[in-house]
Amino acid sequence: YIVTASELLTYRCVQRGIPEDRILPFGIPVHPKFNEKLSRANAAAQLGIDPNMKTILLMGGSMGHADHVKNIESLSQIGTPFQFLVVCGNNKKMLYHVEQFAAHYQGNCRIYPYGFVHNVEVMMSASDCIVSKPGGLTVSEALAKNLPMLLFDPIPGHEERNVDFLVNNGMAALITKHFPIDEAVYELFCNPMRLETVRRTMSEIAHPDATERLAEFVLRKR
């Protein structure tokens, strides 16, 4: 059997010779905590941030592969008072740079640096969008939380295919040299209806119950 992220991928799999009755469009399993309903206000209270400010979650994988300082500098030029939840993973050097930048920053944004965290689901519940590499797990967690995605630097192969699927179905945008992060964020936030449309699309395509569906299928086949 082949487990896929969505029914939208069934045709592609069949075209590659996989029998349709062997395709299980259950979605990608994620930790059950990403399925729990957590209000924005509750999530913000847990993090100690303002629930009424536009909040951007910046991630770069567990190794922190992203230039967060450069991204914050670009986004702060938009003029909107954002809150940045900056997750640096195990990249202690990047965490230090973000902490130093935050300590000397004098603009109208708020910067919250983090190292490796275990409460990504809370951060996603408190955020308006996520800026991240398109790794399969992060993408699946964001889908479960209906969190619009701005993606960068996909690895050739599976991450590029993740980007194609998400962008083609209106759930994400790809940050490039010709479509930089500040333009991507501005376009996402300048029209509130667009954010709502993206979230609605994600809720229709996401399978937050993927883990339960897959487990039930396996138990039936025993």
PLM regions and their residue ranges:
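A short, well-ordered alpha-helix in the C-terminal region of glycosyltransferases
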Residues: 194-208
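C-terminal alpha-helical cap of glycosyltransferases
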Residues: 207-222
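Active-site-proximal region of nucleotide-activated glycan assembly enzymes
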Residues: 1-37
